């Protein structure tokens, strides 16, 4: 859904014709909102029980200002989505070059969970399975992505925080072999334990 550019020249003609006096950014967001609403309505018209959702960037500032996606509106208002799943692919110790820890896992999860949300909309999180072994590019790399249980720790954190679930990007990364094969196996085992898979009731 991201436009090929944020340059004003991209949609000058359409904006001049249909902008209606709105600020350009507001007009673009309104168009995206209309698109999401119509897709949601079309899905429900064909199959009411189908679940429709969107997985935006974990950085909601970028969603709003660069992709013209008003995710806060979709979360708080019925008729846009059934769920939102932000792509939170950073670790617990992630820091930016300027030292900011805003996007460290727990911090950004709490930021999302604090957003107003309608009861009809679920909030789950996308976790970066592809980061295992390779790291997340943090300015202060901590080695957490080589622990063998980072995804499991995240799954537990989300459960404690009251999130509605999680998904892995990409699930296939856990079975890709290569230099991190043993680490991936450890992550799979830890995830299974965190999810109670293969355990029997006492």
Model region roles, listed by residue range:
Residues 76-201:
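Substrate-binding cleft of secreted/luminal carbohydrate-active enzymes
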């Amino acid at each position: 859904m991201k436009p090929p550019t944020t340059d004003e020249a991209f949609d000058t003609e359409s904006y001049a014709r249909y902008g209606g006096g709105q600020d350009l950014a507001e007009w673009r967001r309104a168009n995206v909102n209309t698109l999401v609403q119509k897709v949601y309505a079309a899905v429900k018209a064909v199959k009411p029980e189908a679940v429709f959702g969107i997985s935006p960037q974990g950085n909601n500032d970028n969603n709003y200002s660069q992709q013209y996606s008003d995710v806060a509106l979709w979360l708080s208002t019925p008729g846009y989505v059934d769920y939102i799943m932000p792509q939170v692919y950073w670790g617990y110790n992630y820091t930016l070059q300027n030292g900011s820890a805003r996007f460290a896992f727990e911090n950004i999860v709490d930021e999302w969970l604090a957003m107003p949300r309608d009861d009809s909309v679920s909030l789950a999180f996308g976790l970066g399975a592809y980061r295992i072994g390779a790291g997340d590019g943090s300015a202060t790399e901590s080695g957490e992505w080589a622990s063998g249980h980072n995804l499991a720790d995240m799954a537990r954190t989300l459960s404690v925080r009251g999130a509605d679930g999680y998904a892995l990007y990409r699930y296939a990364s856990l079975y890709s072999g290569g230099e991190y094969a043993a680490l991936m196996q450890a992550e799979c085992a830890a995830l299974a334990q965190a999810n109670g898979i293969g355990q029997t009731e006492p």
